[in-house]
Amino acid sequence: RITGVKLAEGAEYTTTTTGGDNLAGYINEPDNFYDDNTLDYQNPDPDNTQFPTKDTDKWPNTTGDTSSTFLIGGINGGKVAPGEELEYTIYYLSSGELEANNVLFCDRVPDTVTFIPNSFNNGTPGNGGLSGADRGIMLLKDGSEQALTNVADGDIARYFPPGIEPSTVYPTIKCDGANTNGAVEVNLGNLPNATAPGTPNTSYGYIRFKGKVK
């Protein structure tokens, strides 16, 4: 079982929203069961697509629902202007009782932004990435960050431009809708289940990309 939390981490020039939220810190969202280590949702409704699985208390560096140095950001990015950049981070955790096998991640780029292809060109390249290719996807996996390319090459990520469905390459992938504005795909492979918060470090990580406000 994979638990995921998607958060925005602020505009290009500020990390504080117009409502006063600090997107450079931890924000507990009362309507999100999964963004803390408090077990308050243990009998999920299988028909609830927003909260389909049990809650977890295995996020790293997270204390209850009061603090976290891992789950940084919020779901409300505040008021932004065209041309500004937003950074999106999807935190993942293998939170089940068994290893999660053949994990394929897909996230559609929000309709209000345009994917920035070279956001992480200065990051540490991932293994197998094409030399000289733009790197617009950042991955934390197995305790290390790696900047991944947008193209089909030897690394484990790919950006699909609008109109090209990831399912044409990965028939079983689920992106929750048509690819109308771009989609980010990462092949995470097998993820061992977390046995304690942050243990093992191969059980959790994050995927990050940036978009420019239209």
Q: Model-derived features: where do they sit?
A:
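Exported/extracytosolic protein signature
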Residues: R1-K214
